[in-house]
Structures are given as structure tokens and as C-alpha cells.
Amino acid sequence: MIYHVRHRTILRYASPMRLARFNLRLRPAPWPGQWTSDYALEVDPLPSAIDSRPGAWPVHVARLVIESPIRQLTIESRFRIGVQGGAIVPQADDPTIGAVAQAALAERDMGPAAPAHYLYASVRAPLLAEIGAWVGDGLSPDRPIVAAALDLAQRIRAEFRYEPGSTDAATPVADAFAARHGVCQDFAHVMVVALRLAGLPAAYVSGYLRTYPPPGKPRLIGADAMHAWVMLWCGRTRGWIGFDPTNGVITGDGHLFVAMGRDYADVAPMDGLFVGGGGQSLQLMVDVVPEEEMAGGA
């Protein structure tokens, strides 16, 4: 599948923002089975400086410096992206959780996507005993890894309520777990913690999800959003496989990978520091459109 993605952010400030340093993680990092072309980043007003480079993880970071007073900042990211590969399903010969946990410890690779980076607790994904108790025997060492991880994703989908606005980017995973509700970010953190408690390399992924309008209704421009899911290293043969606990599925060609890190903090679409500005408001418009649905095609 080929998609055209537009991500537009408008920040408005109650009083002039005098100085800012922002990090943007909107450009898809290279990832197997996916390609990106025609990337464009527009910032209005133009920043004093902009620097773009790969990050420490599979993430691309654009750093903006703003040194003139402004009351509104508009950022638009656009690109064309192709997602390849067939559906992934559990196999009878998948390695067990115990075998993968041992293999991860033996890996010597220390590149951005090396499993070693994703084995341990991180700032937004502490290894909470209560999550381990909840999982119980669901991730026992003798279970085939892909089937067990899919069961976990489906359990989160069944037992946690998706409730937009009930949490935000700062909500601790412990709070979302205790409340049994939240959004994709919370569910991804819960699954990451559960998998790491079992000794498995689990990463947090930021990306986009293809959505469908209601039957008979037109696609609403700007109504899509970013999404979060989990990447699990399933051994050298299987490699990294995506699991979406919000929807209880293994990821497919409707999941568009942007960035991967230890938790949300590594891949946040935008963060930084600013001076002045007073109160602020955020307007976000996202479109993920299959190329075949665009007038005239590519």
C-alpha cells in the first residue's frame, strides 16, 4: 500500500513567545518493509535555524531554533510512504519466550534497533510488579513468542477501555493500568512493560494508522491522528514484529512506522523548551490517504 500523509500542527500563544528550541520527530525513520519519498517540512514563521539528523534510536529528529517573538507557529510535515509485506501470523515453529530472552542477552549488536536497548526499564516504562502479576502465566517461558504476544495484545484490547481525553502524554503507566482505561499510548506502555518483565526486548512505536470513514460517509479532512503500538524482537529469524494492543492485532500494511524508542519520551512528535508565550493552544490536523483514493493518483 502507498499512502500520502500530511501532519499539520498550529500552536497559538496568549502572549509573544520570545525564544524556543523544539525537537520534531515527524519524518519516518528507515524501517524494513517500508519506504518514504517526497518528504517536506514547512515551518511558519521560518526558524532562525533548523538541523535534521537521525537520532539515537530508529528516529529522525529535526531541531528548530526560534529567536524572534511570535504568537503562532505552524508546522506541516508531508510525505509519500509505501508499506510492503504480507500478513504476519503465529507459526508452529516460532521460538519460545525463554529462548528469545536468552538470545537477546547473547546479541552483540548495539545499533539503534539492537534488542539490548529495549530489555530494561525506562523513564516512561518502569517495570511494575502489578503488571507482572496481572499477566500471570500469559508470558511463561515455554510459550511460543508470537502467539503469546498476540494473546497479550488482545487481552489489553478486551480489558482496557479506549477513552480519548482520559489521559495525556504525562500520565504514568501505573495510573493508566490501575484505571484500566486510556489511549493508544497508555496501552502500548502497558504492553512494553509486560514484555520486558518477561525478559523480552520490547519497543514503543509512534506512527500513523489507516482509518476508514463510516459507510456512505466521506473522508473527513484532517480527522486522522498519530497512533502508538509495540515492536517485539522475536529472535533473529523472525526479527521485530509489531503488535497493536489498542486494536488487538499484529500490525499490517495499515500501520505506518515513523519512529521507535524505549518509550514515548524517545519518539514524541514534538517537544522542547520555550520562553514567554503564556497560555497556549494546540490545533492538530492529520490526513492518511491511500494513493488510490487521491484524484489523479501519484
Segments and roles (model prediction):
Residues R25-Q34, Y39-L41, N247-S281, V288-P290, ...:
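Glycine-rich, small/acidic residue-mixed loop/short-helix segments
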Residues T9, T167, T246:
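Ser/Thr-centric signal marking residues that sit
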Residues Y13, A158, D168-A169, V173, ...:
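Glycine-rich, flexible loop/turn motifs
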Residues T96-G182, A198, R262-Y264, G279, ...:
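Secondary-structure boundary elements
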Residues Q154, D186-G278:
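Hydrophobic/aromatic-rich core segments of domains that either
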Residues M1-A106:
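Intrinsically disordered, low-complexity N-terminal segments that are enriched in acidic
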Residues M1, H7, A20-F22, Y39, ...:
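Structural beta-strand/beta-sheet cores of well-ordered domains, especially the beta-sheet scaffolds
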